[in-house]
Amino acid sequence: MTQDSYLVGLIGSGIGPSLSPALHEREAGRQGLRYHYRLIDIDRLGVGPEAVGGLVRAARDLGFDGLNITHPCKQLVISHLDTLAPQAEALGAVNTVVFEDGRAVGHNTDVTGFAASFARGLPDARLERVVQLGAGGAGAAVAHALLTLGAGHVTVVDALPERAAALAVALNRHFGDGRAAAASPDTLPKLLTDADGIVHATPTGMAAHPGIPLPAELLHPGLWVAEVVYRPLETELLRTARALGCATLDGGGMAVFQAVDAFRLFTGREPDSMRMLADIAELAGTAAVRH
C-alpha cells in the first residue's frame, strides 16, 4: 500500500530562510499527502557540522522518511550512511538521504537539478571554457553537470587549493584526462578574460553569507553567469552581472529541479516541476525564475 504521510527534514547551517519546506509541502498538498518538512539547523542547535551523523541517526530513530543535506554537511555525512547511490558515490557528496528498511541511503539530486535548470535557462550558452567558483559539495555536483552537458573544459577555483585539486582529479578520472583543472583565485583575471561563462557554487550571497564572490571588475558582457544560491534569487553577483549585460541564471531552477528529484525519492510520486517553479518565484517574492 502506498503511504500518504511523510516526515522529512533538512540538515545544514543557516537554513532558516530555506524555501524547501514550502516547496515540498505545497506540492505534497496538491497531491493529497500529509507531508511535514522540518528544518534541522546546526547553528540553532549549537553544534558543528561533525554532528551530522548523530542527527541522521536521530532522524531515523524518530521515524523520518528521509532528509535533505546542505552546506556544510554534504561530504561529512557520507561516512554515516549505509550505502550510496552510484551518482552520490561518484561525486563524493550527498544532498538527499532516504531511509529504506532501517538503512540510510545517500543520493545526490544536485547534478540533475543544475543540469535541468541550465538546459532550460541558458540553452544557447557556449560551454567550451567554463570557470567554476567553489569545490565543495555543491561545486562537485555542478562540475559533474557541466561536463555531462558537454562543457569542453572546467577550471575549478576554490579558497582551499587542495580541495579544488582533488575535485579536478576526480573529474578527470570520471570524464577523461584534460576535462578539468584547478586554479587559485589570483588567476581569475586571466581565466575570466578567456572564459565563456562562470558558475558560482559557494555560500557567498546567501542570506547568512552576504557579499559577492569575486571582484566585480572581473565580470564582462561576454560572460554568462550562473548561480547556485537561490535565497535571495537575485544575489549581488547576478545583479552586477545583469547590469553589465551578461546572460544570467539564478539558483531557483536548480533548487526546484533538485527538489523534484528528492520529492520523487521520498514519496515514489511524480511532482509537477512547472508548478514548483511558479511556487519558488512566488515564495521568493519575485518572478525572477524564468524557465
From Swiss-Prot:
Disulphide connectivity of cysteines: none
Biological function: Involved in the biosynthesis of the chorismate, which leads to the biosynthesis of aromatic amino acids. Catalyzes the reversible NADPH linked reduction of 3-dehydroshikimate (DHSA) to yield shikimate (SA).
Catalytic residues (positions): 74 (proton acceptor)
CDD domains documented for this protein: NAD_bind_Shikimate_DH
Protein name per Swiss-Prot or TrEMBL: Shikimate dehydrogenase (NADP(+))
InterPro entries: Aminoacid_DH-like_N_sf, NAD(P)-bd_dom_sf, Shikimate_DH-bd_N, Shikimate_DH_fam
Residues binding NADP(+): 134-138, 228, 251
Chain residues that bind shikimate: 18-20, 70, 95, 110, 230
Keyword Translocase: no
Assigned EC number: 1.1.1.25
Any single Gene Ontology cellular-component annotation: cytosol
Pathway of action: Metabolic intermediate biosynthesis; chorismate biosynthesis; chorismate from D-erythrose 4-phosphate and phosphoenolpyruvate: step 4/7
GO biological process, one term: aromatic amino acid family biosynthetic process
Annotated family: Belongs to the shikimate dehydrogenase family.
Catalytic activity line of the entry: shikimate + NADP(+) = 3-dehydroshikimate + NADPH + H(+)
Listed GO MF terms: NADP binding; shikimate 3-dehydrogenase (NADP+) activity
Keywords, comma-separated and alphabetical: Amino-acid biosynthesis, Aromatic amino acid biosynthesis, NADP, Oxidoreductase
Species annotation: Streptomyces avermitilis (strain ATCC 31267 / DSM 46492 / JCM 5070 / NBRC 14893 / NCIMB 12804 / NRRL 8165 / MA-4680)
Subunit text: Homodimer.
Pfam families given in the database record: Shikimate_dh_N
Xref: SUPFAM superfamilies: Aminoacid dehydrogenase-like, N-terminal domain, NAD(P)-binding Rossmann-fold domains
